Amino acid sequence: MMNILIIGPSWVGDMMMSHSLYQTLKTRYPDCAIDVLAPNWCKPLLARMPEVRTALTMPLGHGKFALCERYRIGKSLRNQYDMAIVLPNSLKSAFIPLFARIPLRRGWKGESRYFFLTDLRANKRDYPMMVQRYVALGYEKNALPSAQDLFIPQPYLQVDREQVAQTKELFALQFKQAEDHPAVGFCPGAEFGPAKRWPH
C-alpha cells in the first residue's frame, strides 16, 4: 500500500477543489491511503471525502513560518509516507515533507522550492486553472496528460439523510419556504483572480 501525505490548502474553495486530486489518486493508485495535513476547520470537509483516510491538524496558522515547529511536525511523521503532494505554492509548505524524509515530494514551482521537492512541476501556464494543477499532481511527469485531455473528477461531499433533513429544515425556517422546495446555491466567483473562478 502506498501512503500519501497531502499538504492541504488553507481556503475552503481550494480544499473542495483538492477533492478532484484525491479521486484521481485513488483511481491511479487504488490501494493508496491518503492523509491530509490542513487547518483544523477543514476536518468536517475532509471527513466527507471518502478517499481521505485521516485529516491531520496543521497547528500553525496561515502565513506563520515557525521553522522549529514545522521540523517537529515533520519529524513526527517520519517513516509513515511514500509520497507527499504539496498543494500550496509557498516555500514553508514544503518543509514538513522534507523534515519527514518522505522520498517522493511533488508540487508546483514556487518560492524557490527547488531543493525541497523531488518532483517539481514548472509548467503552470499549461494548466491555467487551480483544479487542473491539483489533478496534474496525481500523475507522474512522464504520464501527465495535457490540460485539454486531463480528466477532472467532480468534487462532492458525502452526506447522510439526517443531515440533509436538518439542512432543509434550517433553510425552510431561514428563507421561509417549504422544506420540499428545491434550493440551489452557486458560488462562481473568486476573491483573488481567474484561476479559481468557474469557467464561463
Residue map of PLM features:
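Catalytic machinery of carbohydrate-active enzymes
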Residues: 1-200
